[in-house]
Structures are given as C-alpha cells and as structure tokens.
Amino acid sequence: DMEDALNSYINSINKIDYLFMVAAVSDYVIKEPSINKIKRNKESLDIEFTHAPDLIKAISSRTDATIIGFALETENGEYNAKQKMKDKDLDYIVLNYANEDNAGFETNTNHVIIFSKDGAKKELTLDRKDRISAKLINYIINNK
C-alpha cells in the first residue's frame, strides 16, 4: 500500500546520504478498490483513479540527503525535467527519452542528461546502461 511505502521511506531517510528515486511507484491508484471479485457481467468496466501520494516530494522535504529524481519524457524533456526538479525540491534530475532510438526501455543502452538545482547540465552520451549508471553515480558524488 502506498501509505506504508511512504512511512517506510520516511523512517529510513535520515540514515542516508544519497537517494536515487529511479521510478514512481505509481502515479495513480484506484479511487475506490473493490473488496470483492468484480464479475464479468457488463460489456465494459469503468474504474476511477486518483493521484497516488508523491513519495519523492514527501521525502525531499524531510531529509538532508541528496535527492536524485528521474524524468522519462517524450516531448519538452528539458523543460519538463527542470520543472519536476523544482516542484519536487530535488537536487538533481536525470532526463531520458522514451521515444529515442537505443535508449529508454527494452534496450541495453541509454542516453541521459543530468540537471542540478544549481543550473549545471551534464550529458551522458549513448552507452550501456551499466556504464551510464556508474557515470551517473560518479558525477553526483563528485559534484555535491
């Protein structure tokens, strides 16, 4: 459950120096979950969703740790990533594009751009994901 996850994170954040939040647990949750099985007796089913708690936003205001978020975008990437960094009070945001060849999902390679709240920008060109991860961690630790 989302509230349990939030409480668990909050209870442990004061013990860390860096927090890499690589993906949202869920952006939306079912507004009124059914406690019973939903039978197939209609042609269609409408389910209403509501915003899930924003874990990274809740955490960023309660820790001195360096918080790194990620933004997967398809358009207006730089603007959206910087806005997300500001809105969620992050120290860094890592932008990658879902619609870029050989990057994003279902590939062993990626290309990312790192933005910091102090205005720095660092591009990590297309490389294997394990190398991108190592370069990302090294950059963050050496630029704190």
Residues of each region from the PLM?
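A cross-family phosphate/adenosyl-ligand binding-site feature
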Residues: D1-L72, N76-K144
